[in-house]
A protein has these predicted regions:
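A generic structural signal for short hydrophobic patches within well-formed alpha-helices
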Residues: 15-18, 45, 102, 175
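Gly/Ser/Thr-rich active-site cleft segment
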Residues: 1-3, 9, 25-148
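Short helix/loop capping segments that flank catalytic or ligand/cofactor-binding pockets
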Residues: 14-15, 72-73, 98, 128-129, ...
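Catalytic phosphate/nucleotide-handling subdomain of diverse soluble enzymes
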Residues: 134, 138, 142-182
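Short alpha-helix plus adjacent loop in nuclease-associated cores
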Residues: 4-21
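Hydrophobic alpha-helical membrane-insertion segments
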Residues: 17-19, 53, 76, 84, ...
Length: 182
C-alpha cells in the first residue's frame, strides 16, 4: 500500500486512544498528558490495524520514510533515534520500545515489525549496495550516515543547541522548537 506520510492525519481519532492509556511512555514527548499527534507512528499503526487489518498483518516492516530509504541504500533496516524518540514514544533509558503502551492499544505485534536497531544521528548505517551504487552512479560501499527529522537537524544548523534558544521553522509544516534546561 502507499505509505502514510507524516502529514496524513486520518489517524486523529486514534490519538485520543493513545492519550487515554495514560501510559508512562507518553512522558517521552507529551509530558504524560498529550497531545499526541496524528503525524506519529503509534496512531498511524493503530489506524492501519483497525481499518486495514489484512495489510497490518501482512506487513513485515512498519517504518519511517528515512528507514525505508536507508534500507534501499544499504540493505539494512535501522531506525533513527530522532524519529523514534519524537514519534514512537521510544525511550532508550527505559528499555526503548514502549511495550506497555503498545499492549494497552492492542498493538503488541507492532514492535516486531519495527526495525530492531536504532541508530544515532551521524552514525554510519552501512555501505551503499551495488544496486544502489549503480542506480545513483556512486561508488559501491560509500558510507551512508544516519540522518534525522528535518526540523530537528535544522535546529542544529540554526544554532539552537542551548537552553533558552528557540527556532521557528516554516515550510510544509510550521514548528516552534526550543531547548529548555529541564
Amino acid at each position: 500500500r502507499p505509505c502514510l506520510i507524516w502529514m496524513d492525519l486520518r489517524s486523529a481519532p486514534q490519538t485520543e486512544k493513545v492519550v487515554a492509556t495514560g501510559d508512562v511512555a507518553l512522558r517521552v514527548n507529551s509530558d504524560g498528558r498529550g497531545p499526541v499527534s496524528a503525524e506519529w507512528m503509534v496512531p498511524k499503526a493503530l489506524w492501519i490495524k483497525q481499518n486495514e487489518p489484512e495489510i497490518f498483518e501482512r506487513a513485515a516492516v512498519v517504518c519511517e520514510y528515512q528507514d525505508y530509504v536507508n534500507y534501499h541504500l544499504t540493505g539494512r533496516w535501522v531506525a533513527s533515534i530522532t524519529n523514534v524518540s519524537a514519534r514512537w514514544h521510544y525511550n532508550r533509558a527505559r528499555g526503548g520500545v514502549p511495550e506497555t503502551l503498545l499492549e494497552k492499544l492492542g498493538l503488541s505485534d507492532l514492535a516486531a515489525k519495527w526495525p530492531a536497531e536504532v541508530v544515532d544521528l551521524g552514525q554510519v548505517v552501512g555501505g551503499l549496495t551495488a544496486r544502489a551504487a549503480e542506480h545513483l552512479a556512486l561508488p559501491k560501499g560509500l558510507p551512508v550516515v544516519q540522518g534525522g527529522a528535518d526540523a530537528f537537524v535544522g535546529m542544529v544548523g540554526l544554532g539552537v543547541v542551548r537552553p533558552g534558544s528557540l527556532a521557528f521553522i516554516t515550510g510544509s509544516s510550521h514548528l516552534q522548537l526550543g531547548i529548555s534546561a529541564v
